[in-house]
Amino acid sequence: MIIRDGQVYVSLTSIFKNQDILQQTLQSIVKQTKQPNKIFLYLSEDPYILDEGFKDKKITNPNLLKLINDNAIIHINWVKNTGPYRKLLPLLKEKWEEDCIIITIDDDTIYDDYLIENLVNDYYKHKCVVSYRGFAPLFDELENFDYGQRCEQENLSCEQQLSLYNFPTGVGGILYKPEFFHKTEKLVFENEIYLNTCDKQDDIWFYTVRICNNVNCYLGKKPFHKKDLSFGGLYAHFNSGNANTVALKKTIQKLKELNYQF
């Protein structure tokens, strides 16, 4: 049962070689028990990181094309290729003053039919960022964050599920509202910072900026997917080992230099 009505948007990005799995991901979203008002898909012509780009803005997978043409709620937007940051920032900027919900998803997951319904309901219960995949980092202070030192989501107590420092990961879907970033004004869009400190780790950037805004994160234990279609994504290529830890520490250091408080 949906608690409230309102504009709910799904936002995602993808790369050229993922067209087949993207089609399966989108299919799982258009079949949700709670349909979003719109699905925004951000693609790019220019190559960047793992993406060779969509030359001449052409989608070459016929099944993906048919799905898009058959579902008017899917909107393709061609943008500069900033890698994973396309997933949230373009839509966040467009909807900055709107009282809406933005749910980001990955392009390589067949999602549970109730994902959006559950995320929206949990938002109205907790009024914060919501995700169904993540962890509680174990540290005495944020500067000592270690991506590998954590309490996994399935082991969290009810009290631990809601915390300022919980770390959501994109595959589980992440629910945001533009107002969650308003306290620090346009900080979240400062590409001269995030492209230098965490260019491949968008989760790190949104995590640190959210903390600066003093917005909690609720990590629910509801099912979020039916099948993982991922293979060789950013984490496998760039963010395994201690890359995420290094990126977060660099980001915190830079923001502290700019007098942001944690």
Task: Identify the function of each model-found stretch.
Residues 1-6, 21, 25, 183-262:
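C-terminal catalytic/acceptor-binding lobe
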Residues 6-9, 30-41, 71-74, 99-100:
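Short loop->beta transition adjacent to catalytic acidic/histidine clusters or analogous donor-positioning motifs
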Residues 12-23:
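Active-site beta-to-alpha loop of glycosyltransferases that engages the nucleotide-sugar donor
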Residues 25-37, 45-51:
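Short, acidic, metal-binding catalytic loop of nucleotide-sugar glycosyltransferases
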Residues 40-44, 131:
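Short internal beta-strands
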Residues 44-100:
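Active-site-proximal specificity loops/subdomain of glycosyltransferases
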Residues 91, 110-191:
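Conserved catalytic core of nucleotide-sugar-dependent glycosyltransferases
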Residues 98-109:
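Short beta-strand-to-loop acidic/aromatic patch adjacent to the donor-nucleotide binding site
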